[in-house]
A protein has these predicted regions:
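Short, aromatic-enriched amphipathic alpha-helices that serve as compact interaction elements
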Residues: 2-25
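Surface-exposed, charged secondary-structure patches
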Residues: 41-99
């Protein structure tokens, strides 16, 4: 697998892990004991795939979930990608009830591995920081 394909594969694995977490969390967030387990599972996903930026990981604090889910591969396809050495950008289109949004994930290659470093969404021609 090529260097840049590894970046895409890392993002897809992250999205699959997050989708599984979102599905589990919608069923279990009402139970206080399950909240701690969900928080630990989410932290493990972030530790495996993401840099340690606190703003990127705001969901660890809120445990928020949107419906429809944020990371369902069928409804959030990668529509474009850019590569520049040790950085890669993947653009994901979201369609919620006819309202489209474009997200951009920045990946960085550090310590012999690709990491998600930033998520942004396009608003009025400007990229705005978002959290995972």
């Amino acid at each position: 697998m090529s260097h840049t394909n590894l970046a895409k594969e890392t993002l897809l694995q992250f999205m699959q892990a997050m989708y599984a977490w979102e599905r589990k969390a919608t069923r279990n967030l009402r139970n206080k004991a399950d909240k701690e387990i969900l928080k630990d599972e989410l932290a493990a996903i972030f530790n495996q795939f993401c840099t340690s930026k606190k703003t990127l990981r705001a969901r660890e604090v809120s445990l928020s979930i949107r419906f429809p889910f944020d990371y369902k591969l069928e409804t959030h396809p990668i529509v474009a990608e850019e590569h520049d050495g040790n950085q890669a950008y993947f653009y994901i289109k979201e369609n919620r009830s006819g309202i489209e949004a474009l997200y951009r994930f920045q990946m960085v290659f550090q310590k012999e591995k690709w990491w998600i470093n930033k998520k942004e969404w396009l608003d009025d021609g400007k990229w705005i920081n978002s959290f995972l």
